[in-house]
Amino acid sequence: MRVFTLIAILFSSSLLTHAFSSNYAPVGISLPAFTKECLYYDLSSDKDVLVVSYQVLTGGNFEIDFDITAPDGSVIVTERQKKHSDFLLKSFGIGKYTFCLSNNYGTSPKKVEITLEKEKEIVSSHESKEDIIANNAIEEIDRNLNKITKTMDYLRAREWRNMYTVSSTESRLTWLSLLIMGVMVGISIVQALIIQFFFTSRQKNYV
């Protein structure tokens, strides 16, 4: 009986953690230079709590502006020249919240990944002992899964940034090499013309 209960707990926990993890997913947004993009989220209860995080993956200096506006139009969060950030947003009233990202720095387009995750509601305490143990096990698995997911997202973002930096450096080195070659060719042509001018002027003097 205990084995069957344990199997049932593990099975239900795997289903619930999958459900919790599938409730949200990172949204990729492309921000051309000097543009602004906004996302919207409706909170239906004053007890709702929203976990908000974003990170810049590629583009220039990886810096953007970020604002959160409450349903009444008041700006509750303002960030400038940030590469990444995390918020725990408690309700400022029921209604539609606006999350805006602006690329106001540099002429490079930027790719941003943003996550809006509604925090789980606290389960009622009027439960049996077995249900409490099962819920604790589920919550522990869910917390560990969230930690792993956030760590993987962070590492992936760093990999994107490093790849973009390497690609940008390679492009700059290529153009710098072409510029140096052009300068060397130009100097060689000027030297040849100067030498030719000297020889031509000497021949005229002899004549």
Swiss-Prot record:
Signal peptide range in chain numbering: 1-21
Keywords per UniProt: Endoplasmic reticulum, ER-Golgi transport, Membrane, Protein transport, Signal, Transmembrane, Transmembrane helix, Transport
Annotated GOLD domain residues: 36-118
SUPFAM superfamilies: Supernatant protein factor (SPF), C-terminal domain (SSF101576)
GO cellular component: COPII-coated ER to Golgi transport vesicle; endoplasmic reticulum; endoplasmic reticulum membrane; endoplasmic reticulum-Golgi intermediate compartment; Golgi apparatus; membrane
BP GO terms, sorted: endoplasmic reticulum to Golgi vesicle-mediated transport; Golgi organization; intracellular protein transport; protein retention in ER lumen
Subcellular location: Endoplasmic reticulum membrane
Keyword 4Fe-4S: no
Residue ranges that the UniProt entry lists as topological domain Cytoplasmic: 196-207
Main location class: endoplasmic reticulum
TM segment ranges: 175-195
Membrane topology annotation: Single-pass type I membrane protein
Lumenal side stretches: 22-174
Keyword Transport on entry: yes
Note from the entry: Present with 2710 molecules/cell in log phase SD medium.
PANTHER family assigned to the protein according to its UniProt record, in alphabetical order: TRANSMEMBRANE EMP24 DOMAIN-CONTAINING PROTEIN
Function field: Involved in vesicular protein trafficking.
Family: Belongs to the EMP24/GP25L family.
Full protein name: Protein ERP4
Native species: Saccharomyces cerevisiae (strain ATCC 204508 / S288c) (Baker's yeast)
Species lineage: Eukaryota, Fungi, Dikarya, Ascomycota, Saccharomycotina
